[in-house]
Amino acid sequence: MATTWPPRTVIRKSSGLRTLESALQRSGLGPVAGVDEVGRGACAGPLVVAACALGPNRYESLAALDDSKKLTEKTREKLFPLICRYALAYHVVFIPSVEVDRRGVHVANIEGMRRAVAGLSVRPGYVLSDGFRVPGLSVPSLPVIGGDAAAACIAAASVLAKVSRDRLMVAMDTQYPGYGFAEHKGYSTRAHTLALTQLGPCPEHRRSFINVRRVATRSNGAAAAEREADPPQERDGTG
């Protein structure tokens, strides 16, 4: 008989974030994978999506798991290798800023979730996503509001995505100095806005975001005005 959601097994209160996974596992719908994204609201840098399937006996090893936004950087960095070690499978996808601009944030996010799940080395029996329905998956799925604080597999995916993106933004700070990417990770803080105004957008800024587009428009207008005010000297071609 085919299993369906909601499972007939009663969802009982259990320790940590394992309630949803435990119910699905008991109903024969495992392994259960969680999928989550980081960087959706940033105006610079990639959108990063991770999928993670945890083994049913690995929750105690990851007792500190929680929504990545609630964890300190130190705790996230400590959890990252543990998740990689104890996960049945995980996959991290980077959606570059140019693709975010081309597709739009929401469409890029859904596509990233599809890619992350498809990239898992173990095919999940069920997928839990953080808040968004993910059409086009080859397995049953369920959006969970506040999922990164309600399901261990989503929390694990959240940590994988957050740490992966933060590390990339720190490296980007060296590639594009002056913007402070290592500090604000591409989000629109006051310091980032000031740097963006002074330096103009770099290739990693998302032109589809209005604050970046305004600065880019002003920069292009100023450059055009400068060219008109100081036209190039004519040359006779004789060298």
Swiss-Prot record:
GO biological process: DNA replication, removal of RNA primer; mismatch repair
Positions contributing to a divalent metal cation binding: 36-37, 130
Origin: domain of life: Bacteria
Catalytic activity: Endonucleolytic cleavage to 5'-phosphomonoester
Cofactor(s) required, per the database record: Mn(2+); Mg(2+)
Coiled-coil blocks: none
Function: Endonuclease that specifically degrades the RNA of RNA-DNA hybrids.
Family label: Belongs to the RNase HII family.
Record's protein name: Ribonuclease HII
Organism field: Mycobacterium marinum (strain ATCC BAA-535 / M)
Taxonomic lineage of the native organism: Bacteria, Bacillati, Actinomycetota, Actinomycetes, Mycobacteriales
